[in-house]
């Protein structure tokens, strides 16, 4: 009988130590709901999962960016609607003034309203903003169409680099629409001929505004389609990441119960092994 080294106790102690490590992992998985809580749990799985998490967070932010882009376009369209309504009224007054039954004094009264409406077109252009960004002053105009943009309006609508869309918004000031000279003089309807010319000027302005408004739905439709794709990609990527990283609660609960039983058995065997050497005392009594 050997008493200096209790091999049975050492074996039981070793087994108990590793069993407790398994219990600790089981409890971490059950409490967090994740199978991978540290790199040691599954190094390759963690690497893949982190890449997917990066993509998931990027997709969520891209979806928010997309929504902001739609809001920007809708806001711009609202301001252009106001400007177009004003232009329609100016044209109506020009047609009225071009009629020969009115005196010059009558036309001067009509001119007062026209001048006020031209000023309102300028006011809308200068005050149309989204997050303090001027929208209708040519800031985001298309250089290929004669614009001189001072900034670019990019909607980053993807989770990765270069997944973006540029939007152009033309200049909608009274001068850009031909309603006002560089010196600030507005169109005149003080005579029949001037009123007749004003009709053509306003028609050109309406065409320009209508063209810009017709471009906006194309931008918005694309963003709305992109939003659907982003949500589908987010859903599928999140599901894939979940399969890699999340724990199976039922399976882990069964394993936890098994490890608990084995740990308790190890404790009992360790206690039993520690009493085995007590028999040596009887030999020397």
UniProtKB/Swiss-Prot annotation:
Record SUPFAM superfamilies: Phase 1 flagellin
Molecular function per GO: structural molecule activity
Organism from which the protein derives: Brachyspira hyodysenteriae
Key words of the record: Bacterial flagellum, Periplasm
Function: Component of the core of the flagella.
Locations listed in the record: Periplasmic flagellum; Periplasm
Protein name (record): Flagellar filament core protein flaB2
Record carries keyword Protein biosynthesis: no
Similarity-based family: Belongs to the bacterial flagellin family.
Primary subcellular site in the record, as a coarse category: periplasm
GO cellular component: periplasmic flagellum
Entries under InterPro entries matching the protein: Flagellin, Flagellin_C, Flagellin_C_sub2, Flagellin_N
Subunit details: The flagellum consists of an outer layer composed of two sheath proteins, flaA1 (44 kDa) and flaA2 (35 kDa) around a core that contains three proteins flaB1 (37 kDa), flaB2 (34 kDa) and flaB3 (32 kDa).
Highest rank taxon of the organism: Bacteria
């Amino acid at each position: 009988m050997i008493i200096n080294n209790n091999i049975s106790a050492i074996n039981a102690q070793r087994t108990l130590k590793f069993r407790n490590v398994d219990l600790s992992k089981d409890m971490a998985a059950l409490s967090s709901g994740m199978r991978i809580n540290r790199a040691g749990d599954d190094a390759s799985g963690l690497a893949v999962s982190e890449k997917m998490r990066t993509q998931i967070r990027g997709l969520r932010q891209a979806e928010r960016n997309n929504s902001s882009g739609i809001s920007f376009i809708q806001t711009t369209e609202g301001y252009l609607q106001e400007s177009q309504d004003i232009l329609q009224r100016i044209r109506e007054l020009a047609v009225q003034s071009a009629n020969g039954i009115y005196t010059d004094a009558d036309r001067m009264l009509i001119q007062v309203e026209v001048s006020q409406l031209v000023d309102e077109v300028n006011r809308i252009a200068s005050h149309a903003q989204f997050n303090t960004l001027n929208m209708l002053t040519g800031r985001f105009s298309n250089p290929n169409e004669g614009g001189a943009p001072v900034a670019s309006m990019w909607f980053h609508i993807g989770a990765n680099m270069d997944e973006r869309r540029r939007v152009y918004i033309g200049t909608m000031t009274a001068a850009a629409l031909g309603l006002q000279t560089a010196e600030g003089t507005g169109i005149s309807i003080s005579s029949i001929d001037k009123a007749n010319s004003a009709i053509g000027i306003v028609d050109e302005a309406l065409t320009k505004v209508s063209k810009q408004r017709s471009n906006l739905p194309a931008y918005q439709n694309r963003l709305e389609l992109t939003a659907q794709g982003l949500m589908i990609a987010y859903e599928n990527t999140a599901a894939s990441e979940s399969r890699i990283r999340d724990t199976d609660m039922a399976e882990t609960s069964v394993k936890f119960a098994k490890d608990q039983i084995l740990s308790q058995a190890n404790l009992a065997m360790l206690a039993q092994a520690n009493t085995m050497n007590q028999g040596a005392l009887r030999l020397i009594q």
